[in-house]
């Protein structure tokens, strides 16, 4: 599963996460003069308000009803608008359920869909989804802006959406479940859940300032009553239909598609230049189908022009169709839109009339389709055109709105995509974005510019063809030249046409012609590809950087040819590559080195209790905890832990479990040992680290060494540097802080190798400080030891004592430490000097006692390395006393230990008074078996662990006369491992 982030609460608009914004751009957002809309100026710029996540937290008594049954929740939601939801608890399954109101496609009645919310440890997720969340609030907040596997996004009640203060939210929250029947809950009864007859005018149901219909090409930011749309380029090309539109009369505005009134037009907005589309595709029979209209303050009407690059950003791919088209998938509505067009120039570009203003009297009734409240907005995508610069706003280049076929002049002048941040600030551009800007670059000269504005907004890199999103054409080597990229993309284009209908092929042909007719964009296109490949180190795959939601993968399939059969594997494959940041870690897992992959496999094997090695590691940790509780010597305790780890490593290196994970040609024997050693650090030392430190602290507190160290630390702190023997500079305050920070991080690390690495960096800082007084002069060990004592006396000596012992005894004895060994022993010597500090016998060299201690340590490492052999590997077995899982003890013994010898260990461990009456039994799935004296318990344990299906077994030490199974029959005496 992949963890998904809820919408950021820091953004002023709330629901949409910020994609990276500079200070200057934020100031421009605050300036309300950028978007000059005379009709509804308050809707232009979103005020800083309350995010969706905050609203959900404050109003949870309204929508989070754990004591409410599913039937009661469905009864409440059936009276609400589409998209309304409640979270209740299924008492039978003991899990949360998300209930969502959904208008039925088969009849006039509405239905309530139920989505179980699964809970595993500290995460929540919808059943069937790969996105996980930390809590219910983040889960609901995410599905309010992105649908994932839902038919549409969730919708909050209008009162909660319009709440602009926490006081209003508190008032709503105090109502609890009674909110749904209160006067604060506006159900919007005037808005139909289903579209009326195709010929019925629906303009009367549109409220220009409050009701807006969203679609997959838009993102709506909502703060209180204010709303702001951003064009989402993700679906600009997805919503395209390769239909040949007839030319529009000159001077007309591209109207909204409506089958009932195809001749209605509306004038263009004042001084709003349009982005010219490429030539339309070949003539074909346009399909028919519904479309959901947008409802800005002044909604125009009329047919919609179409071209391969026309951003039909206001079609509703998720809106359910009328009863006549109920067999059509809900997300393919924009594939079946009629595409008659009027008012286009010779190149498919609209004629501009600066100085004209929108006239609402000329608009025709919009098509009878569901409004915004009838069906929630399509999943939000990445905000590409979020910020607006001063120049681009005055120019008024609302490029995407014109080709969508709907006027936004009374609602918002959309910023051009050229005002987005540079590639260095944002994730790489998607295929749709690059294609959109290519159209801009090719027709830049034909865009009229208002007087006094000579500066044009920068043009982003052009876009690649749609078909290049196929995996075969995107996984290019970073070393390939731009020419090779272009040729491979062209081949992918031709291959992809084979499975398309003639209508789609015509659109693809015109797309290729349009892109080839822009020679000025070619170098820029190649440069953009090269820059993306160089900056990431891998080819820039559009499929990997497209969207935050799996829904975009599903929609891409449904917008393609109807002849292509949609398979779940295809959807999952595309979704895996299009979860940009959610699956960030899994995408780069493919680029992990073979060593890293093997390391992860060994860690998983050690954590798998059902495997033999995993059970061995688990038993070892239990045994170590028991062993540490009775130890009185820190050195012996750490040596025993190190010996056990060495034996575990030796066993795994010679076991068949590791051979099943390793490719012999990729790893040498030395590399395998290092990888297994690192994996054991994580699986063994990490969970035992705190227990080891506690035991060491207790041992040193008992023997008085810790108290002696603390007392002499105060003496050293009161000693001058001259008395310490320091003849060089000492670290300054700033450097001393860095050193103390590194020592703190060293104490937090669990790997001995990581600790030694941090120690080396710390010693380098000390050496650099010593050279400040006399640069260039070399300093030896005699100069370093006094300065090291000076530094350690100002650190946490208790932690340093534990860390030095931890590193010296737990480091792999087969590892050649090099200079790490030198500085480790020097640090150990400095600690011993501080613990036994005497002003009279102060010396700048290690004492004889310390040198002898270091020599003994080096001999121990040599002996431990020689003893690490397969024959000395100890195994572990968990034995319970009298009953299964009661007074369990983990016993260490050799693999060839007989049951009689193990019974003697059990008698000593459980302090049995009459051991001759006790025997060792094994209970397998409720059946009891007695082990013969010559039986080998470890081999029986290994046989049971490897048996299929997995069996539940326990070793029990109890009196022989009680050795009967559940049927009161005497237990069978077993000698061989395969006794079942």
Swiss-Prot record:
SH2 domain segment(s): 63-158
Main location: cytoplasm
Stretch list, region Disordered: 1-40, 247-496, 509-560
Domain Ras-associating: 865-962
Ranges annotated as biased composition (Pro residues): 247-260, 274-308
Keyword terms, alphabetized: Cytoplasm, Cytoplasmic vesicle, Endosome, GTPase activation, SH2 domain
The UniProt record lists the keyword Flavoprotein: no
Membership in a protein family: Belongs to the RIN (Ras interaction/interference) family.
Protein name: Ras and Rab interactor 3
Origin species: Mus musculus (Mouse)
Gene: Rin3
């Amino acid at each position: 599963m992949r963890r998904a982030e809820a919408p950021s609460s820091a953004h002023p608009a709330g629901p949409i996460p910020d994609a990276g914004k500079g200070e200057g751009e934020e100031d421009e957002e605050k300036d309300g003069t950028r978007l000059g809309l005379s009709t509804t100026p308050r809707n232009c710029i979103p005020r800083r308000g309350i995010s969706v996540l905050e609203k959900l937290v404050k109003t949870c008594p309204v929508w989070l009803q754990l004591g409410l049954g599913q039937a009661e929740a469905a009864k409440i939601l059936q009276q609400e608008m589409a998209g309304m939801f409640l979270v209740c608890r299924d008492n039978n399954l003991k899990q949360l359920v998300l209930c969502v109101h959904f208008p039925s496609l088969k009849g006039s009645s509405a239905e309530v869909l139920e989505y179980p919310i699964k809970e595993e440890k500290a995460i929540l997720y919808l059943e069937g989804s790969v996105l996980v969340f930390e809590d219910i609030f983040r889960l609901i907040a995410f599905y309010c802006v992105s649908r994932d596997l839902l038919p549409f996004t969730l919708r909050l009640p209008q009162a909660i959406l319009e709440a602009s203060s926490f006081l209003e939210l508190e008032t709503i929250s105090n109502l609890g479940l009674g909110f749904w029947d209160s006067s604060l809950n506006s159900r919007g009864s005037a808005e139909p859940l289903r579209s009326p007859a195709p010929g019925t005018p629906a303009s009367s149901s549109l409220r220009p300032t409050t009701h807006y219909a969203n679609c997959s090409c838009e993102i709506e930011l909502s703060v209180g009553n204010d709303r702001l749309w951003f064009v989402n380029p993700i679906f600009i090309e997805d919503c395209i239909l390769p239909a040949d539109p007839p030319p529009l009369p000159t001077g007309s505005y591209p109207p909204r598609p409506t089958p009932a009134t195809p001749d209605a037009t509306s004038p263009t907005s004042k001084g709003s230049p349009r982005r010219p589309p490429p030539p339309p595709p070949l003539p074909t029979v346009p399909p028919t189908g519904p479309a959901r209209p947008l409802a800005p303050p002044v909604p125009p009407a009329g047919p919609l022009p179409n071209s391969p690059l026309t951003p039909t950003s206001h079609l509703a791919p998720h809106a359910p169709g009328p009863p006549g088209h109920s067999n059509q998938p809900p997300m393919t509505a924009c594939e079946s839109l009629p595409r008659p067009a009027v008012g286009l120039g010779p190149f498919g570009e609209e004629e501009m009339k600066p100085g004209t203003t929108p006239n609402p009297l000329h608009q025709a009734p919009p098509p009878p389709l569901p409004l915004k409240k009838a069906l929630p907005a399509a999943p939000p995508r990445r905000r590409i055109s979020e910020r607006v610069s001063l120049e681009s706003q005055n120019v008024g280049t609302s490029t995407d709105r014109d080709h969508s076929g709907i006027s936004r002049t009374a609602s918002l002048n959309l910023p051009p995509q050229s005002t987005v941040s540079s590639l260095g600030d944002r994730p790489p551009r998607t295929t749709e974005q690059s294609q959109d800007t290519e159209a801009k670059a090719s027709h830049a000269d034909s865009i009229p510019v208002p007087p006094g504005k000579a500066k044009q907004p920068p043009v982003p890199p052009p876009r690649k063809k749609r078909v290049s999103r196929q995996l075969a054409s995107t996984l290019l080597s970073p070393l390939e030249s731009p020419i090779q990229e272009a040729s491979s993309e062209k081949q992918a284009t031709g291959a992809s046409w084979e499975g398309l209908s003639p209508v789609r092929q015509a659109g693809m042909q015109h797309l290729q012609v349009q892109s080839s007719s822009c020679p000025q964009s070619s170098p820029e296109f190649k440069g953009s590809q090269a820059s993306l490949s160089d900056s990431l180190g891998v080819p820039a795959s559009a499929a990997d950087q497209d969207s935050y939601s799996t829904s975009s993968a599903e929609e891409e399939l449904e917008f393609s040819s109807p002849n292509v059969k949609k398979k779940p594997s295809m959807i999952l494959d595309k979704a895996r590559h299009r979860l940009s940041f959610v699956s960030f870690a899994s995408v780069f897992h493919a680029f992990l080195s073979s060593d890293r992959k093997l390391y992860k496999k060994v860690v998983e094997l050690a954590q798998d209790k059902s495997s033999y090695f995993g059970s061995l590691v688990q038993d070892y940790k239990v045994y170590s905890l028991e062993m540490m509780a009775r130890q009185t010597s820190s050195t012996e305790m750490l040596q025993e832990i190190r010996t056990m780890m060495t034996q575990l490593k030796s066993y795994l290196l010679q076991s068949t479990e590791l051979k099943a994970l390793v490719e012999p040609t990729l790893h040498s024997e030395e590399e395998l040992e290092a990888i297994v050693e690192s994996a054991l650090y994580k699986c063994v030392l990490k969970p035992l680290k705190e227990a080891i430190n506690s035991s060491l602290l207790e041992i040193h507190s008992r023997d008085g060494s810790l108290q002696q160290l603390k007392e002499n630390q105060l003496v050293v702190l009161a000693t001058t540097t001259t008395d310490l023997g320091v003849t060089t500079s000492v670290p300054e305050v700033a450097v001393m802080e860095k050193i103390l920070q590194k020592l703190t991080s060293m104490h937090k690390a669990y790997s001995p190798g990581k600790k030694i690495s941090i120690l080396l960096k710390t010693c380098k800082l000390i050496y650099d400080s010593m050279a400040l007084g006399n640069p260039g002069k070399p300093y030896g060990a005699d100069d370093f030891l006094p300065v090291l004592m000076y530094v350690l006396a100002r650190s946490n000596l208790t932690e340093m004592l534990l860390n030095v012992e931890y590193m010296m005894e737990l480091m792999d004895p087969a590892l050649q430490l090099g200079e790490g060994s030198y500085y480790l022993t020097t640090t150990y010597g400095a600690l011993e000097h501080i613990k036994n500090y005497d002003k009279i016998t102060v010396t700048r060299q290690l004492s004889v006692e310390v040198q002898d201690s270091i020599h003994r340590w080096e001999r121990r490492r040599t002996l431990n390395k020689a003893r690490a052999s397969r024959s000395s590997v100890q195994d572990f077995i968990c034995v319970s006393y009298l009953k299964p899982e009661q007074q369990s003890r983990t016993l260490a013994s050799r693999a060839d230990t007989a049951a009689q010898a193990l019974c003697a260990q059990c008698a000593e461990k459980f302090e049995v008074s009459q051991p001759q009456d006790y025997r060792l039994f094994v209970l397998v799935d409720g059946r009891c078996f007695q082990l013969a004296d010559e039986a080998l318990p470890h081999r029986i344990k290994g046989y049971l662990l490897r048996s299929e299906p997995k069996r539940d077994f326990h070793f029990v030490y109890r009196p022989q006369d009680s050795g009967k199974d559940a049927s009161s029959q005497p237990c069978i005496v077993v000698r061989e491992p395969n006794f079942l």
